[in-house]
Swiss-Prot record:
Xref: InterPro entries: Aminotransferase_I/II_large, HisP_aminotrans, HistidinolP_aminotransfase, PyrdxlP-dep_Trfase, PyrdxlP-dep_Trfase_major, PyrdxlP-dep_Trfase_small
UniProt source species: Acinetobacter baumannii (strain SDF)
One GO process term, biological-process aspect: L-histidine biosynthetic process
Name this polypeptide is given: Histidinol-phosphate aminotransferase
Main enzyme class: transferase
Subunit-level organization: Homodimer.
Requisite cofactors: pyridoxal 5'-phosphate
CDD domains: AAT_like
Reaction equations catalysed: L-histidinol phosphate + 2-oxoglutarate = 3-(imidazol-4-yl)-2-oxopropyl phosphate + L-glutamate
Keyword Transferase: yes
Highest taxon above the source species: Bacteria
Matching PANTHER family: HISTIDINOL-PHOSPHATE AMINOTRANSFERASE (PTHR43643:SF3), HISTIDINOL-PHOSPHATE AMINOTRANSFERASE 2 (PTHR43643)
Pathway membership: Amino-acid biosynthesis; L-histidine biosynthesis; L-histidine from 5-phospho-alpha-D-ribose 1-diphosphate: step 7/9
Length: 361
């Protein structure tokens, strides 16, 4: 939507300066193969569907009432699955909302917060929105995070692990190095993709009072359409997040989302099976693309980051779209020759590979 300068006179000065996050395309055309926003190619657990139907058919009258502001049942399910105390769990309307509360709760300090120069592009948006000072730390020549760069003075650290869009993961030992180097500020590990092969930092929670781990049900649990995210930390940090939440939106998760997420956490076998299917498909996709001449960064996510020395990435993305396949292209320095490709089903991945082989390369 185009807004004139005259119309912008009603906007606050801060909003006029905002550079909002640009979400991945959600196409209106139904027959496109969508490999651009890292959604799970498989449906959620059948128990999730049953739980949502039960809310509609057995608790319809309760829809006139507000949901549990604390989402107690969901916190209990997460705590049980993660083997932690309920007081160490915070939930929100997707991990993006949880991250926003994290920025507000912990990062308004005199020193800049640190995060990689190539990472989740919501971080600079939140920093601008909340007036947080920032310092972007360059990835090394292999697009890896060098944890030694995070030992300088700062007002907080946030790292996506595995990183996005590069898909490369840090080890737990490397995460501990960051925590030990920053005992007086909060270190946030954003684990949106951790269930596809990386090591979770949740196991470190009780050892580090400055650690916050943020996760989501959107990727590995196939619940992107319901918006459920959560943070895990020691209770004194959770209390700060609860204070921010209750100053912003006391009822962030609706009854359907609570019921669905609880059911997902209770079906661990289905969760593990689907994650393994994605991992297996990812490894095959990497092999197939490598045979076509792509260089693929080592992935621990449900997507890959790939470049081809003989073909411009932007043109490849456009040609794929013309063939009905959408991937994510970032026209940004250092990564403007890479494509981020969501791992689909084996059939979807085969279509991508065959299209590249027969019609494009």
């Amino acid at each position: 939507m185009t807004v004139s300068t005259a119309q912008m006179r009603f906007w606050s000065p801060e909003v006029r300066e905002l550079e909002p996050y640009v979400p991945g395309e959600q196409p209106k055309i139904q027959n496109l193969l969508k490999l651009n926003t890292n959604e799970n190619p498989y449906p959620p657990s059948p128990k999730v569907v049953e739980a949502v139907q039960a809310v509609l058919h057995e608790q319809a009258d309760a829809l006139r009432l507000y949901p549990d502001p604390d989402a107690t049942a969901l916190k209990q399910a997460i705590a049980k699955q993660q083997n932690i105390d309920v007081s160490q769990v915070f939930v929100g309307n997707g991990s993006d909302e949880v991250l926003a509360h994290i920025f507000k709760a912990f990062f308004l300090q005199d020193e800049p917060i640190l995060y990689p120069d190539i990472t989740y592009s919501f971080y600079p948006v939140y920093s601008q929105f909340f007036g947080t000072k920032t310092k972007e730390i360059p990835l090394n020549e292999n697009f890896e995070i060098d944890v030694r760069d995070y030992t300088q003075p700062n007002g907080g650290v946030i790292i996506t692990n595995p990183n996005a869009p590069t898909s490369i993961a840090l080890s737990l030992a490397e995460i501990e190095q960051v925590l030990q180097a920053n005992p007086d500020c909060v270190v946030v590990i954003d684990e949106a993709y951790v269930d596809f092969g990386a090591e979770s930092a949740v196991s470190l929670i009780n050892r580090y009072e400055n650690l916050v781990v943020c996760q989501t049900t959107s990727k590995s649990r196939s619940l992107a359409g319901l918006r459920v995210g959560f943070a895990i930390a020691q209770s004194h940090l959770i209390a700060a997040l609860e204070a921010v939440k209750n100053s912003f939106n006391s009822y962030p998760i609706d009854r359907f989302a609570i019921a669905a997420a609880v059911a997902s956490f209770e079906d661990q076998a289905y969760f593990e099976e689907q994650c393994q299917k994605v991992i297996t498909s990812r490894e095959k996709l990497v092999r197939d693309l490598t045979e076509l001449g792509f260089n693929v960064l080592p992935s621990k996510a449900n997507f890959i980051f790939a470049t081809h020395s003989q073909h411009d990435a932007g043109q490849l993305a456009q040609k794929l779209r013309e063939q009905g396949i959408i991937v994510r292209y970032f026209n940004k320095p250092r990564i403007n020759q890479f494509l981020r490709i969501t791992v689909g089903t084996d059939e979807q991945n085969a279509r991508l590979v065959q299209t590249l082989k027969q019609d494009i390369l």
